[in-house]
């Protein structure tokens, strides 16, 4: 058993090889910080939600979120404000959130603390992430991205925009799904640890 050997570092307080790996990952993904997660992207998604929501807070999200999001809401007592994506009846799949739907949800729930976006959905559908990030930030809300199926967005050409490139505050990236790593390995990406608490207003 080598789990307590100092050269292997400590995931909860990295100071050597794990810290270096996280710094390299942050650089590769264009994030300010990257945290290695070994509980799958479920743990990354739950960490995102639990870090910005407390009991009674509202969070805007698509109806087709992963169950890890719902589990996080149960744990913290936050209130979901659902956006119902349209359905492609020919293929039988749900689509992404439309800008107009998100704008309506923000207008009707200005007290929401965050907007969560699937980037992409399980079926590869992407919402207009840049526009949604801007709407969320203009309203003083965080924008969180579940990128369980979007690892390749950071490294391929002619790919949809990644969460970090779009300016999302946090993203959960499932390295083992489309990144080629071992099962349950995931990254929690953070663009910035500082966020304003009031909506930005033009002067």
Q: What role is predicted for each listed range?
A:
Residues 159-176:
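Conserved active-site segment immediately N-terminal to the catalytic lysine
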Residues 56-117:
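PLP-dependent aminotransferase-like
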Residues 2-43:
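Conserved N-terminal alpha-helix of the aminotransferase class I/II PLP-enzyme fold
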Residues 194-203:
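Single conserved hydrophobic/aromatic residue that forms the stacking wall/gate
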Residues 91-152:
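Active-site phosphate-binding strand-loop segment of PLP-dependent enzymes
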Residues 165, 186-192:
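Short beta-strand-to-turn element immediately C-terminal to the catalytic PLP-Schiff-base lysine
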Residues 33-56, 71-72:
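Conserved beta-loop-alpha segment that forms the PLP phosphate-binding cup at the N-terminus of a helix
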């Amino acid at each position: 058993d080598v789990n307590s050997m100092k050269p292997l570092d400590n995931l909860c307080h990295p100071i050597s090889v794990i810290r270096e790996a996280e710094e390299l990952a942050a650089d590769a993904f264009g994030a300010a910080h990257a945290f290695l997660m070994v509980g799958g992207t479920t743990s990354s998604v739950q960490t995102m939600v639990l870090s910005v929501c407390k009991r009674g807070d509202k969070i805007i999200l698509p109806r087709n979120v992963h169950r890890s999001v719902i589990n996080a809401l149960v744990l913290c007592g936050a209130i979901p404000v659902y956006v119902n994506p349209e359905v492609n009846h020919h293929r039988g799949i749900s689509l992404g959130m439309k800008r107009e739907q998100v704008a309506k949800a923000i207008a009707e729930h200005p007290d929401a603390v965050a907007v969560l976006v699937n980037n992409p959905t399980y079926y590869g559908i992407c919402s207009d992430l840049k526009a949604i990030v801007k709407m969320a930030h203009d309203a003083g809300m965080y924008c969180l991205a579940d990128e369980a199926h979007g690892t390749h967005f950071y490294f391929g050409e002619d790919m949809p925009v990644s969460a970090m490139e779009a300016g999302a505050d946090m993203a959960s990236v499932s390295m083992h799904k489309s990144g080629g790593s071992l099962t349950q390995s995931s990254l929690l990406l953070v663009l910035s640890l500082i966020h304003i608490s009031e909506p930005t207003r033009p002067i």
